[in-house]
Amino acid sequence: MTDIKNIRNFSIIAHIDHGKSTLADRFIQVCGGLSERELKEQVLDSMELERERGITIKAQSVTLHYTARDGETYQLNFIDTPGHVDFSYEVSRSLSACEGALLVVDAAQGVEAQSVANCYTAIEQDLEVLAVLNKIDLPQAEPEMVINEIEEIIGLDAHDACRVSAKTGVGIDDLLEQLVERIPAPEGKRESDLQALIIDSWFDNYMGVISLVRVKEGRLKKGDKILVKSTGQTHVVDSLGIFTPKRTETKLLEAGEVGWVSGSIKDIHGAPVGDTLTLAKTPNVAALPGFKNVKPQVYAGMFPVSADDYEDFRDALAKLTLNDASLFYEPETSDALGFGFRVGFLGMLHMEIIQERLEREYDLDLITTAPTVVYELALVSGDILHVDNPSKLPEGSKIEEFREPIARVNILVPQEFVGNVITLCVERRGAQINMQYLGKQVALTYDIPMAEVVLDFFDRIKSVSRGFASMDYAFERFEATKLVRVDVLINGDKVDALAMICHLDQSAYRGRALCEKMKELVPRQMFDVAIQAAIGSKIIARQTVKALRKNVTAKCYGGDVSRKKKLLQKQKEGKKRMKQVGNVEIPQEAFLAVLKVDD
């Protein structure tokens, strides 16, 4: 077994596309974790979706052995982290298991907002942060400028930052040497009682729940009886080991090491992420401080297309929740869509990914309603209510004031695009808090309503700045504002799944836009279909989908006009009867139309 002073636990922090997964590949190659044949690009992005979108979603871990120049062999436990803003909680989780972090910055692009946010998370957790410049093989790389940026924006001392190219493998050895030298060894006594932190869990159909753990104190071996602190349940360890990136069994895990444990836990919530494991015979070991539970920012209704899939859908959600601690769900029924769940997400990317994972990994067809954020209502009775579903809003007369969540948004953008970004923030009802020039970049801080941020702000900001701006956001507070619920009526019936909450100033416009969009999507019937948008009992917009009609007077050649009138009158009455009993099928696209009502 490796001596504790020769263990190094670290993770890599970087913005999307700054090359952390490729750097991980190089580490694995240099330390001989996989044979040449098994090495595919981005080994750690094991989920199909991750490979397809080229982003890291789940944290992964790898244990490598590296023989340094001083002849010692070090055990490197490397935990990969995602870079996208929606997954920042995954990052804080990975970091809590490490003593150090590599801050990887693209030498051509410079510092970006997510790296700043994640870097502060690392510094708050007292980790040793090493700056690394990646992609120095690119002709447009400007290492000197980027080093200044790191020092100015983040305040890290970066004059001796390692310069590497993960793609070509330049400088990787020096980086590993620096890593071994500067990142501290874990603290912990192997003789004391077991104390281990669960970093991540996932469900395997054969082995039950498998947990990724970081052993802080003591040791864990096969056959041990372990106790999960929060649930109080005990399990016997069936197998444990490390990832090399393949799952490899070992005899024991000791203080300072990171590895996986399986205890044939069949209950999906048997090993919650952030929990502490200890031996059953030492139940009063203190629980480790877990990570803060993340509150979902966006809620949407998800409904299976066919009602028979409801049970499968429920099981699939339960399995995903195990793997993704930030997912929240509760059952919901809708008149238009039947039984389903109200699911909470961290942001729109997270929502898309969960929906794709449900559709791919569990073979489900789902309809998703328009996402909403959580609003706070002060009622006339003095109660405070939190609402995440437009159809659950009480009547207007009962509401004293409406409060919407405000997000503090930090944006880093090159100087030439500042104007566009500011315009966008103002359109989104943002209030400027701060603005400072740092080298070639400008740091903007805005308070923007969460509802405006989560939907497509990220995409919009990328498009107005040609992809150079980067942002990160966090919930700040609730603020009173004028909001209304816009209902959609089809032939006078409310469709609950299409309701949306928006600002009073935008309501007439959004109602009109939605009706126009719906008119294109609702198929023509045998009778006129009226599509209306209403606030309370006041109709603010209307579109009519015209009826299909047969030309009943075609068979009359000449003849008396009263004959034609009679036929037309008869047709009219038929249509009227149809309209009373007919109901309109609303296609799936129409529910998504609510999302696409552009500003």
Swiss-Prot record:
Q: Catalyses which reaction?
A: GTP + H2O = GDP + phosphate + H(+)
In its UniProt record, a GO molecular function of this protein is: GTPase activity
Under PROSITE patterns, the record lists: G_TR_1 (PS00301), G_TR_2 (PS51722)
Which segments constitute the tr-type G domain?
5-187
Residue stretches in coiled coil: none
Q: Which SUPFAM superfamilies match?
A: EF-G C-terminal domain-like, P-loop containing nucleoside triphosphate hydrolases
Function summary:
Required for accurate and efficient protein synthesis under certain stress conditions. May act as a fidelity factor of the translation reaction, by catalyzing a one-codon backward translocation of tRNAs on improperly translocated ribosomes. Back-translocation proceeds from a post-translocation (POST) complex to a pre-translocation (PRE) complex, thus giving elongation factor G a second chance to translocate the tRNAs correctly. Binds to ribosomes in a GTP-dependent manner.
Q: What is this protein called?
A: Elongation factor 4
The species this protein was found in: Alcanivorax borkumensis (strain ATCC 700651 / DSM 11573 / NCIMB 13689 / SK2)
